[in-house]
């Protein structure tokens, strides 16, 4: 249903945001930005 679709979208968006934050943090820590 629509609710399940929205939940999946939120999960996917959350994962993407987390991955982006981790990438940014590790690149800043290693000085390879």
Curated annotation (Swiss-Prot):
Tissues showing expression: Expressed by the skin glands.
Coiled-coil blocks: none
Any one annotated GO CC term: extracellular region
Pfam families, per database record: Antimicrobial_2
Main location: secreted
Organism domain of life: Eukaryota
GO BP annotation list: defense response to bacterium; killing of cells of another organism
Function (record text): Shows antibacterial activity against representative Gram-negative and Gram-positive bacterial species, and hemolytic activity.
Stated family: Belongs to the frog skin active peptide (FSAP) family. Brevinin subfamily.
Protein name listed in UniProt: Brevinin-2Eb
Species, as recorded: Pelophylax lessonae
